[in-house]
Design a protein with these regions (language model features):
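The Walker A/P-loop phosphate-binding site
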Residues: 1-149, 168, 172
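C-terminal regions of RecA-like/P-loop NTPase motor modules
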Residues: 1-21, 85-88, 94, 99-101, ...
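Phosphate-binding/switch loop-helix module in NTP-utilizing enzymes
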Residues: 118, 157-222
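A short beta-strand-to-loop transition that corresponds to the Sensor-1 phosphate-sensing loop
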Residues: 130-132, 183, 230-234
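Catalytic P-loop NTPase motifs of RecA-like helicase/translocase cores
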Residues: 135, 187-188, 236
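A glycine-rich helix N-cap at a beta->alpha junction
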Residues: 149-157
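Phosphate-binding/switch region of NTP-binding enzymes
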Residues: 170, 202-320
């Protein structure tokens, strides 16, 4: 055996994990889908599990609505995965009981213990951190979110460091399959929390968020948890051109595997016909999505989904346009 092989075994034994290995397996990144077919097409299936995703954009762009849509689909996905696993174990136990051999009798207690642990743990949960204090539970329910099964964190006088530590500890339990932080700019670091309004602070949320990203990424991978951070946009006053920036610093941007910009697009009436920007009572609007950064799929062109204020996400016209896009790509 080579010296490197012995050293690899020694280090893996020392750290009690197979963190060093020769060769790599192709790891399929699981996704939590949007309800929008165009959004799923752009992101190759939705929000990646085990990664950090950022939704950012101006007010009314559809960031929170899209995040809640992901929450609803995540709950369905987690329930289905739980039911499938339980049914699989029950089926295995049943087959072994029918065999009635010594080897089967040895395996049954282990499988029963495994089944008991899974049933006690239950399906994975959605964690929603409402730092803005603006979550409308009725709107969330209209989007399909089961708010009774969702863990809601509403910080009162906690600093950014304390809120981020709460998130870290909850995800490390392994029971959380999706975490939504709404939103990053509302986190107040300890340094700013203790100072008066007149005193100017530098750095802001960047430093605690950078440390948080370094700590949370391994937990997201091990516990198979997706993380969505909702962010706002700011005008960059230091530039002579009309440019925008987002709070959180460069460390946050580097940690994100997927960054999606949301824009409020054309206003619509009840028949999904376009209205002027000055219309007083629109029934909904198109939501523009742009993939700004991705490590999990190819960057595609911008897409638009349909949102009605009474029927939430209106899919009928979107399916039609999605078919047209696929037909166009097939021709060319």
């Amino acid at each position: 055996m080579r010296a490197i092989d012995l050293k690899m075994q020694e280090l893996n034994k020392k750290f009690k994990a197979d963190i060093i290995q020769q060769g790599t397996d192709i790891i399929e990144v699981d996704k939590i889908p949007f309800s929008s077919p165009m959004a799923n097409y752009m992101t190759y299936g939705g929000v990646p599990v085990g990664k950090i995703t950022e939704f950012f954009g101006g007010e009314g762009g559809g960031k929170t609505t899209s995040a809640l849509d992901i929450c609803a689909n995540a709950q369905i996905k987690f329930e289905e995965a739980y039911d499938k696993k339980v049914a699989q174990l029950q089926n295995e136990i049943g087959l072994l009981e029918v065999k009635d051999t010594k080897e089967a009798k040895k395996k049954i207690p282990k499988l029963q213990q495994q089944l008991k642990e899974i049933e006690e743990k239950g399906p994975k949960l959605v964690l929603y951190v409402d730092t803005e204090q603006t979550l409308d539970t009725q709107w969330a329910q209209l989007l399909g979110v089961d708010t009774d099964k969702m863990i809601l964190v509403r910080p009162q006088e906690q600093t950014a460091e304390q809120v981020l530590q709460i998130i870290l500890e909850l995800i490390s339990t392994g029971n959380v399959g999706l975490c939504v932080l709404d939103s990053i700019p509302c986190l107040v670091p300890q340094q700013i929390f203790e100072e008066s309004m007149e005193k100017k602070a530098y750095g802001g949320i960047s430093q605690p968020l950078r440390i948080f990203c370094s700590k949370i990424l391994p937990h997201l991978t091990v516990n198979q948890c997706a993380f969505i951070g909702i962010n706002q946009i700011r005008e960059d006053l230091s530039s002579m051109y009309s440019t925008i920036s987002t709070p959180g610093g460069k460390g946050w941007k580097h940690a994100c595997s997927l960054r999606i910009r949301f824009r409020k697009d054309t206003l619509l009436d009840m028949n999904n016909k376009e209205l002027s920007s000055r219309a007083e009572n629109p029934a909904g609007n198109r939501v523009g999505m742009e993939i700004v950064k991705t490590k999990v799929c190819k960057v595609l062109i911008m897409s638009k989904s349909y949102r009605q204020y009474t029927q939430v996400i209106h899919l009928s016209p979107e399916y039609f346009h999605f078919y047209i896009v696929l037909l166009f790509l097939d021709i060319y």
